[in-house]
Amino acid sequence: DNCLILANFVEFDTLFGHRRDAEGYARALEWFDAQIGPILAQSRPDDLVIFTADHGNDPTWRGTDHTREQVPVLVHGQNLAQTQASDRMIAFQDVAATVAAHLGVVAQGQGGNFL
């Protein structure tokens, strides 16, 4: 029953972030925000849903380089204890270790399960 679905919404980055298209970026975020509820409504009790990004791009900033190194990590699971906010820094290796633990796989490397 355990599986992994990875979806990369590259359009935020390639079509709007690097192009500095603030209006397009806003529309894409609004569209994505409207999809979160239906996605979570279809999740099963043992599912773990993680939303994050590899970097940020402020579409109002000049140039085409990445403008944000810190990005949010949003986690949903019906079996998680509670909703909480944290300023804790979570690295990609931690996301990988958390997914591995959820799937029952021994993680390799230095990451830690953040749940």
Model-derived segments and their meaning:
Residues 1-115:
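Feature captures the catalytic ectodomains and active-site-proximal regions of enzymes
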